[in-house]
Amino acid sequence: MESPSYKNLIKAEDAQKKAGKRLLSSEWYPGFHVTPLTGWMNDPNGLIFFKGEYHLFYQYYPFAPVWGPMHWGHAKSRDLVHWETLPVALAPGDSFDRDGCFSGCAVDNNGVLTLIYTGHIVLSNDSLDAIREVQCMATSIDGIHFQKEGIVLEKAPMPQVAHFRDPRVWKENNHWFMVVGYRTDDEKHQGIGHVALYRSENLKDWIFVKTLLGDNSQLPLGKRAFMWECPDFFSLGNRSVLMFSPQGLKASGYKNRNLFQNGYILGKWQAPQFTPETSFQELDYGHDFYAAQRFEAKDGRQILIAWFDMWENQKPSQRDGWAGCMTLPRKLDLIDNKIVMTPVREMEILRQSEKIESVVTLSDAEHPFTMDSPLQEIELIFDLEKSSAYQAGLALRCNGKGQETLLYIDRSQNRIILDRNRSGQNVKGIRSCPLPNTSKVRLHIFLDRSSIEIFVGDDQTQGLYSISSRIFPDKDSLKGRLFAIEGYAVFDSFKRWTLQDANLAAFSSDAC
């Protein structure tokens, strides 16, 4: 007898296949970011290099461009750039995941691709807390078709815990370890977030070890984050990293400007003890970056991908039948107790026509240019020592009628500013990152049809900060300009590349 989830899987796959090539007409459909063929996408899940290919799973609702009972979408790649959409991996409907296959991870268990995910059950529609969440397993030999194995971890660390989700598993000294987020409630707060640590010998029988870290007064988070979602725990350089997505932090100055955050704490790990040594630091300074997940590339690089969106932000692409995409894959490094992120070198595969201007000097002036395509990579070096302008930078995706996305250095604030108040349909707001204390600032920019990603560096280090935001300009907004306001600005180098549309391949996949 076919299980309810198998029937739902067939329906989901049928919805994905019916999408066909209709998204090619969407003016905002990305050219080089992983994006659903139809419906809704959020958290990346199960990133792994398995049998010679990179696999990316993701939270997916294929029936409409809104959040619904979560499935696991699936894509694979050989180069981290060209992704092939595969059949839907998981669908909800069984007793243990009736209302959603929530986020989780993937591990290679002796040649068996094994997914560990959260089964979500709604107990009542009267409250968001009337839920039950358990950790489940599914396995695959071919890496495409999965067999559910049911619940492997049922009990949360404490009684009466409803929110208990997003397992991340790794192997260390012949033991499997798992971190998973959970929430305890008290009378004064909406909730308090924690990360629990478990251990197993076989991936099926898990023992609670301890609460790895909780939202307490010893951390600058205080008791303000009511849930810690999507935890990850890994080594980078000579430090251990606890990465997670806290919900409920209040904005403070330039920090915590989004509804929810994504960041990390550095510390020392002597199993089973994690000793934090830094405060919580955000990974990205843009409007749209959440639920990041990390994995190890075939050459040992630590690579991160995040959901390139944010809860409650406007999603104009819903009119075209899709919502959500992933950030570019980013290489992680640890420099001076800070994680730095740079786009993976494989992105250079997409470079086509190149335009180079060696030195551009402006004095209260503009330097216009035209983009051949909305798919652009830009490298700009700004000489701070030789410049006096109050503001200097770029206007991108302009149409000559007021539509533009502004990226500029503001000397009065010592910040790099992204202003998307005129960036197209239903988006607004300003985000910023610190201006590096350096003589020259390097801006590495990727423009897709509905996004901008900026990597900020100094003389020595690329990727000190990143700013990732969605924009929704008109398709003919292809003008740009360099500018300097109230003084002169020296741009030592200005390089631009038109990029190939890597996502066209997704529409010719046999799986879709």
UniProtKB/Swiss-Prot annotation:
GO CC annotation terms, alphabetical: cytoplasm
Coiled coil: none
Subcellular compartments: Cytoplasm
SMART domains associated with the record: Glyco_32
Record's keyword annotation contains Hydrolase: yes
Molecular function per GO: beta-fructofuranosidase activity
One Gene Ontology term from the biological process aspect of the record: sucrose metabolic process
Pathway: Glycan biosynthesis; sucrose metabolism
Chain positions recorded as substrate binding sites: W40, M41, N42, D43, Q59, W67, F102, S103, R165, D166, E229, W311
Reaction it catalyzes: Hydrolysis of terminal non-reducing beta-D-fructofuranoside residues in beta-D-fructofuranosides
Active site: D43
Domain of life: Bacteria
Keyword Secreted in annotation: no
Entry's EC annotation: 3.2.1.26
Keywords: Carbohydrate metabolism, Cytoplasm, Glycosidase, Hydrolase
Family: Belongs to the glycosyl hydrolase 32 family.
Entry protein name: Sucrose-6-phosphate hydrolase
Species name: Zymomonas mobilis subsp. mobilis (strain ATCC 31821 / ZM4 / CP4)
